[in-house]
């Protein structure tokens, strides 16, 4: 059958920039998926997606002009229902055949075959292939239904009465199969070979496409458009680096901003702008955020990462004289920077300490009170954690940092740029003469804010960050605001993971259960429901997920966490020990034996003794196991006590032979109650020795 490459383009009004990348990818993927399902293209066909501010497109290789005919087997009904005793068609069968467009003459061609329950009648036929025109129309509508459109527009078509819903009005439709247009109509448009280039700089309008493969090249040469999103993005990166390098500077790295400006321009032109040096007195985070969020500029940093007074503009036009474009952008950014400077100057007229009382007027949650009440709770938790980790000195600093941590929420700068909460608190605290470790703790108490984010830089910050997250978790769980499914409006999963990361990566010698108890004690009695266990288990789930993401298997993680370790900062070392143990030749047999021991002890009636009496042993195998335990247990315990979990587990390898012999030669559930109790006590000793680092029975297949 004839194949050729297919090009499809929707020419639209300006698409939402933050959604463009996903729209382009989703359009091409859904279009291809539908064509594959209809048999018009192979599942492995190469696909290129195009997305620019005014177009969505896809280029798909080796698309059929018509899909192949397909043999179809249709089950009709059981033979007993379709044929009478003489083998003639029943009315039920004739009615079913008529519904399929056949008559009584088809009865002789029906096939008999078992359907697994009874013998049934099947009709074999051939489904004619679908033309590309029909298939593409179906694929287009299906793909448009699947687009992740943030907000749909309703607009009227040119006929004056038809209304359609789409992300933006569609003004052109291209569908080329090789050199031939595909007969498709949608949005009141007939597909053709004409498209449009850059709004201002196209050399030709319209652009008449020669064939499907010429699309990208013709758009760039005749239309001044780089249609491929990835290529346009790469060109922006190249130009940014080329503009910054001669100055010895580097543009701020921001992947989201890069995607957004790629979605705002069709052919990028990077230009250099600058502002007055005086604005650099304002914290650079404020200036950078202002330029990125409001103007979509790329601020330039020096080799030390310090902001300079220069920035890069990604323009959509390339005039012979760019001074007007640069000058216009410099004029626009100046008031923005002036506002930031004004906010900074005004905010410093009032200390953070003086703002704290104002938090009593800010509602945090209608069931949990004000931000002022919350600050008091966070202070109490931070003090307690500080006392545990560093004594009175750390507790006092943690208390001060917790008191001031939320005060910057009442500043003009944070009111304008909420993203700067914490950051501005640090600057204002330093201006007020607060010690640096306390000031940095104010900024850092929000960390980690996202996966892979840095942790607090000093112990004071760690105390306040833990306190802030624990107070949030306990408070919201206590009033029933738990995450459900993919809904987590208060980012409680992120908070819990932050606590887990700090405990592990900062090697903090404090138990998770103790931290949860400290946090609950900070709340007024009767304010919260009984949610201690829920919070604890929720955080353990985050710990389990974090360890699996680091490459540990579910069995390895389960083996360690099933013992509910008090110190989760030791969990990674214990997991490494479990992994090393699992590699031993004796591991599988010992894991299976441990599982068997656990099952025996669970079924045992009454209380099982903690240790066996060697004087009651009858069999040589139980004496040998007791002797082996007497030799191995102290070594394993000593290694465990010194933190050498690998050695503690590996010491168990010596138990394989005596354990195997014990189960081969000894009847645990002996008729003599005293003998049975002694053997159960021996197994209890074995179980405790084997399960000190991890429950190795979880490693059993």
UniProtKB/Swiss-Prot annotation:
GO terms for biological process: arginyl-tRNA aminoacylation; glycyl-tRNA aminoacylation. Keywords: Aminoacyl-tRNA synthetase, ATP-binding, Cytoplasm, Ligase, Nucleotide-binding, Protein biosynthesis. It catalyses: tRNA(Gly) + glycine + ATP = glycyl-tRNA(Gly) + AMP + diphosphate. Its EC number is 6.1.1.14. Its main location: cytoplasm. It is an enzyme of class 6 (ligase). Transmembrane segments: none annotated. GO terms for molecular function: arginine-tRNA ligase activity; ATP binding; glycine-tRNA ligase activity. Pfam families: DALR_1 (PF05746), tRNA_synt_2f (PF02092). It comes from the Bacteria. One of its GO terms (cellular component) is cytosol. It is found in: Cytoplasm. HAMAP family: Gly_tRNA_synth_beta. Tetramer of two alpha and two beta subunits. Belongs to the class-II aminoacyl-tRNA synthetase family. PANTHER family: GLYCINE--TRNA LIGASE, CHLOROPLASTIC_MITOCHONDRIAL 2, GLYCYL-TRNA SYNTHETASE. This is Glycine--tRNA ligase beta subunit. It comes from Thiobacillus denitrificans (strain ATCC 25259 / T1).
